Amino acid sequence: MTRPKPVVLCILDGWGISSRPEQSAPDQARTPNFDRLMRGCPHGTLVTFGPDVGLPKGQMGNSEVGHTNIGAGRVVAMDLGQIDLAIEDGSFYENAALGEFIRKLKASGGTAHLMGVVSDGGVHGHIQHVIAAARAVTDKGVPVVIHVVTDGRDVPPQSAMGFVTELLGELPEAARIGTVVGRYYAMDRDNRWERVARAYAAMVRAEGLPAPDAAQAVADAYARGETDEFIQPTVVEGYAGAKDGDGFFCLNFRADRAREILAAIGQPDFSAFDTGRRPEWAALLGMVDYSTSHDEYMQAAYPKRQVVNTLGAWVAARGLRQFRLAETEKYPHVTFFLNGGKETPEEGEDRFMPASPKVATYDLAPEMAAPEVSAKLVEAIEAGYDLIVVNYANPDMVGHTGSLPAAIRACEAVDKGLGMMLEALEKAGGAAVVIADHGNCETTIDPETGGPHTAHTTNPVPVIVFGGPEGAKLRNGRLADVAPTVLDLMGLDLPPEMTGTSLIGRA
């Protein structure tokens, strides 16, 4: 057959397959274009969690893990498992960068400020990493203040009290909790600097709502009607803020939602909001590399391992043109993560990132920037790129709110975009691989509590090939098989590093 051009990799972020259609937004939504694909095209399912994507057994996937594996075309061992193993075998406590951090604080006489998401969700961080770091630092005689970031998004919306109680029970004597802050404020990634400013004010200047202890901070938030994600920055009695000679250690291992708060804390030329006089930090440490700019003022306990010969790099090496498209909420995913942790575009790689709407939560604007993404996708198809990667954020971002009516509207907005894409591809003679990176909006009710379900799932996700070889069949697989499938459609061989295999079987 004639090689299709362009080939579109269309990622429906958070669109899983549920066995309970009554609570599934994709099942309840009117999606004629997705339905057309499922009726008329080869399709299968993908595994997006656990060892199939480089995570511990049973651990749900997420967008970072998903896009990393998609772009790599191989199973990539993720940071969660690496850090868990280091804590288990004791090597974490001998980590060179952590040792240097401790030495600098012993020399300055300062306090170590530890910030991390306190839950067992395992998407951005883990409570056990916070506990291990507190022990490692206090064992060497350095006092610790912990800045608790409450989750409620990758775990049930009102589970923080249990995690705070667990943390308090495990902390060494020389460690205490200084602040309690919902991730809505501390872990923004879309330039909502007014939120980040409030988290910064609490952690660094001890300015926020008062509470006698961390458990009461959570209880007070619940009394105000706030769930864990949205707990307003709260300062625990006795915490007076950071001072010159202190150090700051971010325990989150996922980059995208750590970058903004860390820039406010340490970036020399930071100007997004007025931080006032910042402490002269003796040391700044991250669990991982957060970006090349962060590397200029922070060390990393576990530096990123470069993934070579990704989908984008291989296409670029063949002299072909590619286009990356997503609204700003998913900007890092189709660029940094898909390119194996590389910030800069590949040769011949163009990008367009329309702004996500500035609303408090995305159930208030479930269409998000999908209309603009869809219009730009049609333009890119008509422009003659060889490869286009597009991410629709709606199913995931709206799914995180737990609102089924809003998630239905989100899926319908994405389906309109699918219709526009299919029409443009038919005119251009192109093809598409339509997938999801993990599930979310297909489960809106928590089966255990009966309340809203806001986390990712371990459900299978769809994979569909449009415009592929005549009579082709599709087998089931995992995310590592996506890049080989795309390269197969493009008529390209695989780099030796790609151990995934094409899902396309020919008659």
From Swiss-Prot:
Example of a GO MF term: phosphoglycerate mutase activity
Main enzyme class: isomerase
InterPro entries recorded: Alkaline_phosphatase_core_sf, BPG-indep_PGM_N, Metalloenzyme, PGAM_B_sf, Pgm_bpd_ind
Cofactor: Mn(2+)
Gene Ontology biological process terms, A to Z: glucose catabolic process; glycolytic process
Ligand binding (Mn(2+) 1): 396, 400, 456
Domain of life, source organism: Bacteria
Function (record text): Catalyzes the interconversion of 2-phosphoglycerate and 3-phosphoglycerate.
Listed name of the protein: 2,3-bisphosphoglycerate-independent phosphoglycerate mutase
Originating species: Paracoccus denitrificans (strain Pd 1222)
Origin organism lineage: Bacteria, Pseudomonadati, Pseudomonadota, Alphaproteobacteria, Rhodobacterales
Name of the encoding gene: gpmI
